[in-house]
Amino acid sequence: MWLYLAAFVGLYYLLHWYRERQVVSHLQDKYVFITGCDSGFGNLLARQLDARGLRVLAACLTEKGAEQLRGQTSDRLETVTLDVTKMESIAAATQWVKEHVGDRGLWGLVNNAGILTPITLCEWLNTEDSMNMLKVNLIGVIQVTLSMLPLVRRARGRIVNVSSILGRVAFFVGGYCVSKYGVEAFSDILRREIQHFGVKISIVEPGYFRTGMTNMTQSLERMKQSWKEAPKHIKETYGQQYFDALYNIMKEGLLNCSTNLNLVTDCMEHALTSVHPRTRYSAGWDAKFFFIPLSYLPTSLADYILTRSWPKPAQAV
């Protein structure tokens, strides 16, 4: 019996391996539009796809970022400036893409642009910072997707939305987690709504990686600033010792961020080029072996595991 079971499992993984490696044909003729290409995942993905021969349309927030990217890639790659929080900028970028892709449509849309600032507790976070994260990480994704959707539908292409493992397990930085949970929900809803048009939607959930968003110096400085600007009653409730302990925990976490960004961009590339893309990709060992298993535990147990090393506030009961 065990021999039959082992043979069945082996056959399953062999078929899975074969299925995962089926690649879309004529990649050199396909256009992919990527947001957030100034740095980080978007920048690396743009260079990675360009090296593979795809026609990359890279959206950068700044002209400086666009110029630097053009200097690192072939003449095939073209850039446009895009602020995903402004509808007029999205409309202009959509028209620009339309002029480039023509009747063939847009094969790939990668919603990668995102921000994480500041790293702090919900109660310390001001409304403006929360709204900025929602505007970029969630509303921007929705507006760019809906604007580009007719072009993607024409090509029967792919949409890749970059969420986070914190869109699966909410842990710290409330505004960021809320925005990423929203990306997950939007992606699931849209995937079901447009399933009959041949468009495939994938969600990429990176763990902790060292990018511009997790720059240690900037992140810790913003955390200090957030605490400094917190109302007096907040400081009395939590206490300076609580902040200092939490600051050290965050510092250690940022130091342990992975530097291998290819773990994420390889997932994005697979979602764009595979005949059978996955619905979800968990990128990074922390995502695969800690956060994903954690998401299936009873909530009370997950809460304990996530917060067991946290300090207690000054006025804790």
Swiss-Prot record:
Gene Ontology molecular functions: 5-alpha-androstane-3-beta,17-beta-diol dehydrogenase (NADP+) activity; all-trans-retinol dehydrogenase (NAD+) activity; androstan-3-alpha,17-beta-diol dehydrogenase (NAD+) activity; androsterone dehydrogenase [NAD(P)+] activity; catalytic activity; electron transfer activity; estradiol 17-beta-dehydrogenase [NAD(P)+] activity; oxidoreductase activity
Catalytic activity: all-trans-retinol--[retinol-binding protein] + NAD(+) = all-trans-retinal--[retinol-binding protein] + NADH + H(+); all-trans-retinol + NAD(+) = all-trans-retinal + NADH + H(+); androsterone + NAD(+) = 5alpha-androstan-3,17-dione + NADH + H(+); testosterone + NAD(+) = androst-4-ene-3,17-dione + NADH + H(+)
Highest taxon in the source lineage: Eukaryota
Cellular component terms (Gene Ontology): early endosome membrane; endoplasmic reticulum; intracellular membrane-bounded organelle
EC number(s) on file: 1.1.1.105, 1.1.1.209, 1.1.1.239, 1.1.1.53
Binding site residues for substrate: S164
Keyword NAD included in the entry's annotation: yes
Chief subcellular location: membrane
Tissue expression from the record: Detected in liver and prostate (at protein level). Detected in adult liver, lung, brain, placenta, prostate, adrenal gland, testis, mammary gland, spleen, spinal cord and uterus. Detected in caudate nucleus, and at lower levels in amygdala, corpus callosum, hippocampus, substantia nigra and thalamus. Detected in fetal lung, liver and brain.
Active-site residue list: Y176 (proton acceptor)
Enzyme class: oxidoreductase
Residue numbers binding NAD(+): 33-57
Localisation: Microsome membrane; Early endosome membrane
Keyword Glycoprotein on entry: yes
Signal peptide: 1-17
CDD domains reported for this sequence: type2_17beta_HSD-like_SDR_c
Pfam families: adh_short
Keywords, alphabetical: Endoplasmic reticulum, Endosome, Glycoprotein, Lipid metabolism, Membrane, Microsome, NAD, Oxidoreductase, Signal, Steroid metabolism
Membrane topology: Peripheral membrane protein
Swiss-Prot/TrEMBL GO biological process terms: androgen biosynthetic process; androgen catabolic process; brexanolone catabolic process; retinol metabolic process; steroid metabolic process
General function of this protein: NAD-dependent oxidoreductase with broad substrate specificity that shows both oxidative and reductive activity (in vitro). Has 17-beta-hydroxysteroid dehydrogenase activity towards various steroids (in vitro). Converts 5-alpha-androstan-3-alpha,17-beta-diol to androsterone and estradiol to estrone (in vitro). Has 3-alpha-hydroxysteroid dehydrogenase activity towards androsterone (in vitro). Has retinol dehydrogenase activity towards all-trans-retinol (in vitro). Can convert androsterone to epi-androsterone.
Similarity comment: family membership: Belongs to the short-chain dehydrogenases/reductases (SDR) family.
Annotated protein name in UniProt: 17-beta-hydroxysteroid dehydrogenase type 6
Gene from which the chain derives: HSD17B6
